[in-house]
Every structure is written in structure tokens, then in C-alpha cells.
């Protein structure tokens, strides 16, 4: 079976759990043996693992015809996409997009992140998806999270192929109920057009009025530890050799994750004992507010903000921790507690997490 998949991030360049989940899903599908996966990403770097899938960099897909020679195409984008694919995609431009800002190859640029003009990038991504869907041969479409639902819908309209959307979370989870109408509309539209809705838990579609017949819970998991990570865990100090205890929060420092509860709990604990350090690893829109909150509570001497972590850094942080805490206000199915448990670290999670 040939799968045309739309994603937003992918290791080693990840910004959160979506990239990690996308990697695990694609690798698991590829292991089935009869799957041919083509993953579309807004702005891949070229160093992603291509061993089990094909990657199309959407920022190298032309939407405006430019007469460019092969040598120049090879020089500009050869490390990410073959010139043959570029020219084949160029032959499938389906409309006049000269009103769009494009580069010297006729391509739309993407940040590959979550910029202020995210809605514009999502719309542009769906435009490019129309070119890809006309050029590629595939049996089914798989769209990851709301960012790629419009692309998945467009690909379905072009090809007539079934659409599977993967709901990793909804705006109800991310916003504590203060739903962005635009985001909700995109999510609802994606679910309405989908032939199958994959959810990480059964609760994420309650507000979207979907038929249970097309909704399936597909829970997250983690892969067995790689040798490099096993070596990190092997050097974890026994509890009796540790002078201080470390309690860790690791994730996006944003409303959904409940970071203020972690800071407030730390302040309460430190009223009883000072032999504990608290680590809030990650980044997000509430990071500065949490630094200020820790300062107001007078606990900055026992509180650390190491910033965003990835790869082995994550496992090094777990192995220096005695307890992992995930105080999420809403968490469909967090991966980080599973990673912590792999390292032998006890996890405390909120009851509404998964």
C-alpha cells in the first residue's frame, strides 16, 4: 500500500511530541513490510532518516513555473530533493499562483515551525499539497494533526483517495477550553472530510460530533531503547549515592501542560525541605511567566530552567531525576511519562492525562 502522508515536524528537528509521534508511526508502518510511505514536510533539513520512507520537502515543490536549468536546481535543492522530482512536480502545477510570493524556483517558503503567520503557512501548505497529490501515486492519505488537515482534504479532493486524519490533540486540550474558532473550524472540517479518524485516546473527539463508526483509538508508545540511550541509563547513580533529590518537568511550557502547578507544588515542598531541586526543561510561551513565578515564590535557588532538550539530552535529564511530574490540565496521551519509565524514573501525572 502506498501512503501519502502530511506532517509538520520530524526528527532530528522536533519542537514537541508531534515529531516524535510521527517518527514512531511511520517507522511502525514501514515495519509492516507492504507499506510505501511518502512523507511531506514543510521545511526538512535533509538530514532526516530516509531509510524507511520518502520525504518531499514542500518548500521545494514549485507552484509557479520558472525556466531553470538542471545544474542550478541540483545546486539549490539537490541535498533535499532530486531535480527529476522537481521537474515532474513542475509539470503538475494546476493553477496560476503568481500572486503568491515564491522564490527563484517558483516555490513557497515555509518556516517549518509555528510562526505568527501560521494560518497562512497552513493554507500555503494545502496549495502545495495539490501539486503533490496530482504528481504522486498513492492509495491512501494520512494527515497528522490540524496543521495538515487542509492539505489532506485537498489531496482527497484531487485524487478521490480515502483520507485518514490523526488527531494527536485538539484545541480543547491545548487551550483549556478557550478554543480558537479558526483552529476549531480547521479541526472540525478535517474530521468531517475524513474517512477514518485516528485518536490517541477516546476523549479527543467528544466536542466534534463525529460518528463513532469512523473513530479509532490508537495509543502512543515508545520504542525499545537504542544502545546509546541504554548506556546513558546504565550510568544512572543509585538513589543512596545522590546528595539531593531532583524532580523534573519536561515538555512544552504552555497552558495545556499546567506548568504553574509544578511551580506552586515546588514552592510547597520547599517549605518543608530544601534538599530538593526542581527542573523545568522545555520551552514555550509561558516560560518567562514561570521564571517570574518562581522568583515571586522565592525558590529560584532550587529551580532550574535548562531550556529545550532533544535526543540524548532528554534521557540524560531523566537519569538525573528521582521523580518525573506531568501536571497537564489536558493530555490526550503523553509520551514523556513512558520515556521516564523506560529510565526507571517514577512518574506522577494528572488524572486527566490519557
Predicted regions and their residues:
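Nucleotide-activated donor-binding/catalytic signature segment of Leloir-type glycosyltransferases, i.e.
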Residues: 289-309
Amino acid at each position: 500500500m502506498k501512503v501519502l502522508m502530511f506532517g509538520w515536524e520530524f526528527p532530528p528537528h522536533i519542537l514537541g511530541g508531534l515529531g516524535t509521534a510521527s517518527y514512531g508511526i511511520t517507522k511502525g508502518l514501514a515495519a509492516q513490510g507492504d507499506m510505501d510511505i511518502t512523507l511531506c514536510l514543510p521545511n526538512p533539513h535533509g538530514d532526516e532518516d530516509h531509510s524507511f520512507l520518502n520525504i518531499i520537502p514542500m518548500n521545494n515543490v514549485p507552484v509557479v513555473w520558472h525556466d531553470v536549468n538542471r545544474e542550478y536546481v541540483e545546486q539549490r535543492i539537490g541535498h533535499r530533493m532530486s531535480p527529476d522530482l522537481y521537474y515532474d512536480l513542475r509539470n503538475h502545477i494546476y493553477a496560476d499562483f503568481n500572486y503568491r510570493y515564491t522564490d527563484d524556483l517558483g516555490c513557497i517558503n515555509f518556516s517549518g515551525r509555528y510562526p505568527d503567520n501560521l494560518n497562512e503557512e497552513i493554507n500555503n501548505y494545502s496549495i502545495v499539497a495539490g501539486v503533490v497529490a496530482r504528481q504522486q501515486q498513492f492509495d491512501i492519505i494520512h494527515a497528522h494533526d490540524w496543521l495538515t488537515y487542509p492539505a489532506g482534504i485537498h489531496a482527497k479532493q484531487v485524487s478521490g483517495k480515502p483520507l485518514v486524519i490523526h488527531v494527536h490533540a485538539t484545541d480543547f486540550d491545548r487551550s483549556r477550553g478557550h478554543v480558537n474558532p479558526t483552529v476549531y473550524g480547521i479541526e472540525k472540517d478535517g474530521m468531517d472530510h475524513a474517512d477514518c479518524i485516528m485518536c490517541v485516546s477516546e476523549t479527543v473527539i467528544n466536542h466534534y460530533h463525529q460518528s463513532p463508526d469512523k473513530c479509532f483509538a490508537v495509543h502512543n508508545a515508545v520504542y525499545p531503547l537504542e544502545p546509546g540511550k541504554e548506556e546513558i541509563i546504565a550510568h544512572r547513580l543509585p538513589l543512596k549515592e545522590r546528595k539531593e533529590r531532583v524532580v523534573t518537568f519536561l515538555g512544552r511550557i504552555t497552558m495545556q501542560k499546567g506548568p504553574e502547578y509544578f511551580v506552586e507544588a515546588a514552592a510547597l515542598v520547599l517549605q518543608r525541605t530544601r534538599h530538593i531541586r526542581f527542573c523545568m526543561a522545555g520551552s514555550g510561551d509561558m516560560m518567562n511567566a514561570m521564571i517570574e513565578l518562581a522568583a515571586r515564590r522565592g525558590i529560584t535557588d532550587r529551580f532550574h530552567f535548562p531550556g529545550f532538550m532533544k535526543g540524548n539530552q532528554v534521557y540524560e535529564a531523566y537519569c538525573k531525576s528521582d521523580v518525573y511530574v506531568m501536571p497537564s490540565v489536558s493530555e490526550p496521551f503523553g509520551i514523556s511519562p513512558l520515556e521516564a519509565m523506560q529510565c526507571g524514573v517514577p512518574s506522577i501525572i494528572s488524572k486527566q492525562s490519557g
